[in-house]
Regions:
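Catalytic machinery of carbohydrate-active enzymes
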Residues: 1-353
Length: 353
């Protein structure tokens, strides 16, 4: 990532993006970054984002500068925002604010950035000077909304928004070290991501993951269970006592997950942030949808298979099943996923030894 440009020394427009607070949304925001670089050659792009997301931003060649906003979830952090804004004064010509909260628009306003663009939301009339009305029926996907803010308003009225696919860089040297450190084998690897930050109505049953892991090992695969520290117990439930199944939840950094997912042949995943990471490194994705909708936040890749039952009660977008049965995920069988993985494997290129 390039060093920040001193005030007035950048050759093109200086654009600051206030980024989202979730892993998947940050990956999807790369589509906006790619659009800005294509539309404004020579521009310098800075991103204000939670500190945890900086390793992901470092894998995006479009980002010239990533600036950490170290404010806890739900915390206002007035002093932190004000200090950050002061450090940014005079350094940017335009700000694009992706979140719709009032506090998200504070830093660009306090930094006195001349043009401040975002969707109308939470009474931000004084903070943004180019407010856009969000028509959710027209801009019907999160990624479309992000990219639209980087385009002239008139270009997106019909909902036709060109979406470049996110593509995260992979660190081969780091991958080699990870393979050594965690004792990973030469077997073809399948990734599993059992977590979903939103809630249990987005989580495939752990017993299904374990049944699938057992079957995949019997077919000659290695299974890597990936997630954060909160997912460690789930990972242990899947991996316990199984040879060639590695519980890496909470044992790797987010940047490590990028490299490990790129090294997998395929992944089986809930609708989660790591699903979007896997899509952005070109790994084939088997995405499990229960309470959420693939129409709204799909994996941005042509190499994906969506697994959903399309029940009358879904998508409900609830954190926990309002009906108490979560049939939308319970009835997605491990046998269905095994068949899908094996069928896809027959179509994928053979790995070089």
């Amino acid at each position: 990532m390039a060093e920040p440009a001193p005030p007035g020394e950048s050759g093109g427009e200086r654009i600051l993006v206030v980024g989202p607070s979730w892993v998947g949304d940050m990956v999807m925001a790369q589509s906006l970054f790619m659009t800005l670089k294509a539309r404004h050659p020579g521009c310098r792009l800075g991103v204000v984002a939670p500190g945890w997301s900086l390793p992901v931003l470092e894998r995006m060649p479009e980002v010239d500068e990533a600036v950490a906003l170290d404010v806890g979830h739900g915390e206002f952090g007035w002093a932190t925002r004000r200090a950050l804004a002061r450090s940014l004064r005079g350094r940017f010509d335009r700000a694009i604010v992706l979140p719709r909260s009032w506090k998200s628009a504070l830093v660009p306003w306090l930094a006195r950035i001349p043009q401040r663009v975002g969707f109308t939301g939470e009474q931000r009339y004084g903070l943004l000077n180019e407010r856009r009305r969000l028509d959710k029926a027209v801009l019907d996907q999160t990624v479309k909304r992000f990219v639209a803010l980087g385009l002239p308003a008139g270009e997106t009225l019909d909902g036709h928004v060109p979406i470049p696919r996110p593509r995260l860089a992979v660190d081969a040297a780091n991958l080699a070290e990870l393979r050594r450190a965690h004792g990973l084998s030469s077997r073809p690897a399948i990734g599993m991501m059992p977590g979903a930050e939103y809630g249990p109505a987005k989580q495939w049953p752990l017993e299904h993951f374990r049944t699938l892991a057992e079957a995949l090992v019997a077919e000659g695969f290695e299974v890597r269970v990936l997630g954060g520290p909160k997912d460690a117990e789930a990972g242990e439930a899947i991996a316990r006592g199984l040879e060639h199944v590695h519980n890496l939840c909470g044992r790797t950094r987010l940047a490590d997950a990028v490299d490990l997912l790129a090294d997998c042949r395929q992944v089986v995943t809930n609708d989660s942030g790591l699903m979007h990471v896997a899509a952005a490194v070109g790994t084939r994705v088997h995405a499990l949808y229960g309470s959420s909708s693939p129409a709204y936040t799909p994996p941005l890749t042509d190499s994906a298979e969506i697994h959903t039952l399309g029940l009358d009660c879904s998508p409900c977008f609830a954190r926990t099943c309002p009906l108490g049965h979560t049939r939308c995920l319970v009835e997605l069988s491990p046998e269905r996923l095994l068949a899908a993985v094996l069928a896809a494997e027959r179509r994928l290129p053979v790995e070089e030894a």
